[in-house]
Amino acid sequence: MAPDVAPPVTAPPVTGEVPREAPRDLAALHGTEQTRTYPCNSCGAELHFDIKLQKLACAHCGAVHDLSVDLTQSAVEQDLRTALEALQNGRLHGQRSISAEHKEIVCQNCGGHSTFSGSLTAERCPYCATPIQRDDVHNAPDRLAVDGVVPFQIDAKSATSVIDEWINSRRFAPTEFKTYNRTGSFSSVYTAYFTYDADTEATYTGRRGDDYTVTVGSGDDERTETRTNWFPVSGVVTNSFDDITVFANDGFDRARVAKLEPWPTQTAKSYSPEFVAGHLCRTYDNDVEQCMGEATTKMEAEIDQTIRRDIGGDRQDVDSRIIDWRKMTYKHLLLPIWLLTVIYQDKPFQVYINGVTGEVQGARPWSKVKIIAAAVIILVVIIVLIVLLKSRKS
């Protein structure tokens, strides 16, 4: 079976961009043979993670290599308090941090950070479609290590079909948007997420309200009113949370990215660079401490619901609650997104595809010319119909 080679839009990418034309020589951006992470045993060219085969494949000679990692090994949870102490005390170096062998691209236009290993073959920033310059490449700083990855399941051909269908269904989209393969950047990108686990015990005080009805008034003014008896309550409730996900990147439409959920985080494999070979990885912009607030907000909302269920009755009024957080762990995961970025009238428009489920979310520009043309056509049709009706009456 021929390997699935990620096809590029504007450039020949073995790094995740989707090709529409024959690859060009990008030797200026390539590392030496010694810096290549996974050279092919057959020809020496660089291997990439083939999404369709779920193996390492060579786009040059077609050779396929099994992954060296244990595919049955799941991502391991890490102690949250230990990570917070390391971040606060600046002790990431020498701890569980991303290897210094990684290189990092920092886009000069949008500030987006991406990491890669071995050779870089992407020509455009996946987030704003700005051409990548050699000065954009730096050594990656120390960051919390990646614990797991959910590999791409939607390959380049399928992703292209999905995005074409989505774009073609957008009426009044400008031609520049529909010809994204010439004007945009379409890339396979692993985005950064933190997942949080915790066991909680919440002690609360409050009031329980039981409704009852009474009849008041007389005659024509007789009516039924609902009243409430309130009783003081207190109690203890427990909750267990698993994989509360928080998106750790900036520069995306977070509301649209949230609609790509749910993610099958339970299928996350223990991280190995083999899974991301040939694809870009977005490093986190917000660390595990900065993302924790969003996670605890989600958990507290569920705890409040648990308290209200425990109080019972028709109405609940919570006066106080004290939460004891236990067994707090996290995972730093890479989750797969096909990212289309098209610049239209100097504004970037992004479309996202969940690389596992194929769910599509995105923003599209509107063509004023097409809208005006459609309005004119409708107006002409209305005028013609009016003229025909008048001619029939006469």
Report the location of each language-model feature.
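Low-complexity, intrinsically disordered extramembrane tails and loops of integral membrane proteins
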Residues: M1-R36, V64-I98, V137-A140, T267-V276, ...
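Residues immediately within or flanking Cys/His clusters that coordinate Zn2+
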Residues: T35-T37, K55, A100-E104, A122
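Short cysteine-rich clusters marking metal-coordination/redox-active sites
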Residues: C40-C43, C58-C61, C107-C110, C125-C128
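Cys/His-rich microdomains that often coordinate metals
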Residues: L47, H65, S114, I132
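Short Cys/His-rich "knuckle" micro-motifs
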Residues: D50-L53, S68-L71, S117-L120, D135-N139
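Charged, low-complexity helical/coil segments in non-catalytic cytosolic or luminal regions
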Residues: S99, D142-I343
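Extended, hydrophilic extramembrane loops/domains of integral membrane proteins
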Residues: L335-Q361
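Juxtamembrane boundary at the C-terminal end of a transmembrane helix
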Residues: V384-S394
